[in-house]
Amino acid sequence: FEGPCADVEEAVWYIDKLNAEAGFEAFSFCLDVGHANLYARNLREYIKALGHRLGIMHIHDNDGQTDLHMLPYSYVRNNGKDHIIDWDGFIAGLREIGYRGNICFETFRCMSAFPKDVHPQLLDLICALGRHFVNAITAE
């Protein structure tokens, strides 16, 4: 069930139309990385096409079939050799557009999967992943 703006050209048109009607850059796009993976989107190309319109992201991982909301880098194939989501392409696309917007981890199912007594360590890991993404996106 692809939703509105799953097609990047439609998303660009829609955001540009809304901003033109507003008379200023009032609207931007929220990229749900897990949903893009479910619909086999090339993240790098999708991000590049959005360009400056990309304002925030919901970052999470899945198996390519179900919207699981797990930690980035969680799902691999070929005995751990290949990630299901092209995280390198994702980072490259963000670097190419000079992304400096917000990131949001959508990992609630991951949190519910672990015992409460390890939640502090899990939150530390999520924070470390956030630093990883920021450093990779902004590296010179």
Locations of regions flagged by a protein language model:
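Histidine-acidic metal/acid-base catalytic patches
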Residues: 5-31, 37-140
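Divalent metal-binding pocket/active-site signature
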Residues: 1
